[in-house]
From Swiss-Prot:
GO terms for molecular function: rRNA binding; structural constituent of ribosome. This is Large ribosomal subunit protein uL15. HAMAP family: Ribosomal_uL15 (MF_01341). The gene is rplO. Keywords: Ribonucleoprotein, Ribosomal protein, RNA-binding, rRNA-binding. The keyword Transcription does not apply. PROSITE patterns: RIBOSOMAL_L15 (PS00475). Belongs to the universal ribosomal protein uL15 family. Part of the 50S ribosomal subunit.
Length: 144
């Protein structure tokens, strides 16, 4: 047996529809498309989202907000993630090296979430008020 000799068991698959081969076949003349109308024509089909003249869903729902393009370049860092960085200084490069943020991130903000158990110096990152207090309470400092 070879790959080009593989075939399904006889009778296991229905034979293909042979359209337009005489009226006795049941699929002759109009070929299963009915009479006239958009869907009987070649290349004729309704546009995606068309609901037969009813107001489409996309137009029934209100417009709402927008997606910020800058969002993909800004990261949020929790306090417990700062502890994963090796060394005392935490900046963008150190966060990327520790695999905490993606390579394309341009700016990051430290937020008060989790706990910080060692002193670190945060450089060049934005820091929330609560996170700033937590960093200084742990013996670290924030440099802008």
């Amino acid at each position: 047996m070879r790959l080009n000799e593989l075939a399904p068991e006889p009778g296991s698959r229905p034979s293909a529809k042979r359209v337009g081969r005489g009226i006795g076949s049941g699929l002759g003349k109009t070929g299963g498309r009915g009479h006239k109308g958009l869907k009987s024509r070649s290349g004729g089909s309704v546009a995606p989202g068309f609901e037969g003249g009813q107001q489409p869903l996309a137009r029934r729902l209100p417009k709402f907000g927008f997606t910020s393009r800058q969002q993909r370049y800004v990261a949020e860092i929790r306090l417990n993630e700062l502890a994963k960085v090796e060394g005392d200084v935490v900046d963008l490069a150190a966060l990327k090296k520790a695999d905490i943020i993606r390579e394309e991130i341009r700016e990051a903000k430290v937020i008060l979430s989790g706990e910080l158990d060692r002193a670190v110096t945060v450089k060049g990152l934005r820091v929330t008020k609560g996170a700033r207090e937590a960093i200084t309470a742990a013996g670290g400092k924030v440099e802008d």
